[in-house]
């Protein structure tokens, strides 16, 4: 009898399945690689392990803090980072070089209560050498704080208007002063003789401020000088106490309403018929002034 031979088909079928599985995994890897490559181009990140996630997470919080930081905090940080400002703040707080760390004890609490400051929590700023703000305030004398408060609450000067005020900062508007010609002591200056009280000494009486004395003739205002040919004639007439045409008639004190006026022209009285012809020739003539001479007061004759 012959024995049946075993089938070889099952082992061959297993080999085919193995090749198919390898091929499927290879294709899946290629597809995943292509997907990651496409996502990287679009801006996504593909991580193969979770070990790199904490590193990225540690870098992100500082960026978020900078974005969410307030402008006031930035200003305070810039002020504190500057060395000159830090020194000024230390001087304001009244710290000394020999002071160490602040000792939190009951003795400090009792001393603060004795000084008049209420109980508070001790605070330390700008390093360990800086004392507590409330303690430094209590150590200062009250006069200094009162002076500062008075300066902060001082009233504005006249002519200033407050436009904007925030805390100690104040924006004021100063009005322009137009009295530039005044001195610092407030007395105005005289720019011209005619504008103020300053007048020439000679023109005070001519303006009407003074009046002639009693018993004297009125003041005569002379006109421009006559030519030399008529100078002798006018001089002789003045010695005879007559008023020529070259003099302006004035009023006497005794008769203010009337004026003694002598007109020697063709319209006035003509003492002699040949006067106009002689004056036209330029010859000096002696006038016949009988009846035209004014009677002066006795005191004027004595002068």
Curated annotation (Swiss-Prot):
Residues 274-295 have a biased composition (Polar residues). Residues 148-158, 172-188 have a biased composition (Basic and acidic residues). Its main location: membrane. Induces activation of MAPK14/p38 cascade, when overexpressed. Induces apoptosis, when overexpressed. GO terms for molecular function: collagen binding. Belongs to the RELT family. Residues 194-212 have a biased composition (Gly residues). Keywords: Cell membrane, Membrane, Phosphoprotein, Transmembrane, Transmembrane helix. It comes from Mus musculus. The modification Phosphoserine is found at residue 52. It is a single-pass membrane protein. The chain crosses the membrane at residues 15-35. Residues 47-68, 135-214, 249-303 are annotated as: Disordered. This is RELT-like protein 2. GO terms for biological process: positive regulation of cell-substrate adhesion; positive regulation of p38MAPK cascade. It comes from the Eukaryota. It is found in: Cell membrane. Interacts with RELT, RELL1, OXSR1, PLSCR1 and TRAF2. Pfam families: RELT (PF12606). GO terms for cellular component: basement membrane; extracellular matrix; plasma membrane.
């Amino acid at each position: 009898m012959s024995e049946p031979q075993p089938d070889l088909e099952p082992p061959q079928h297993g080999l085919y399945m193995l090749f198919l599985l390898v091929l499927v995994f290879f294709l899946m890897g290629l597809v995943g690689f292509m997907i990651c490559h496409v996502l990287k181009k679009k801006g996504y990140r593909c991580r193969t392990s979770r070990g790199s996630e904490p590193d990225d997470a540690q870098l992100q919080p500082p960026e978020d803090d900078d974005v969410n930081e307030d402008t006031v905090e930035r200003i305070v940080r810039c002020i504190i980072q500057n060395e000159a400002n830090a020194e000024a703040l230390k001087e304001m707080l009244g710290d000394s070089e020999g002071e160490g760390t602040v000792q939190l004890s009951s003795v400090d609490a009792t001393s603060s209560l004795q000084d008049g400051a209420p109980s508070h929590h001790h605070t330390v700023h700008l390093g360990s050498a800086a004392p507590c703000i409330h303690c430094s305030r209590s150590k200062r004398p009250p006069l200094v704080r009162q002076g500062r408060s008075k300066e902060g609450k001082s009233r504005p000067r006249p002519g200033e208007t407050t436009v904007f005020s925030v805390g100690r900062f104040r924006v004021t508007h100063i009005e322009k002063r137009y009295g530039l010609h005044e001195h610092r002591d407030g007395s105005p200056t005289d720019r011209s003789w005619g504008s103020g009280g300053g007048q020439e000494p000679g023109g005070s009486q001519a303006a009407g401020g003074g009046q002639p004395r009693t018993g004297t003739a009125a003041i005569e205002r002379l006109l421009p000088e006559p030519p030399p040919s008529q100078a002798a004639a006018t001089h002789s007439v003045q010695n005879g106490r007559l008023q020529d045409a070259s003099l302006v008639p004035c009023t006497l004190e005794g008769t203010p309403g009337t004026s003694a006026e002598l007109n020697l022209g063709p319209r006035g009285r003509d003492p002699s018929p040949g006067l106009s012809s002689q004056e036209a020739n330029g010859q000096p003539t002696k006038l016949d002034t009988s009846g035209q001479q004014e009677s002066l007061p006795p005191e004027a004759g004595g002068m």
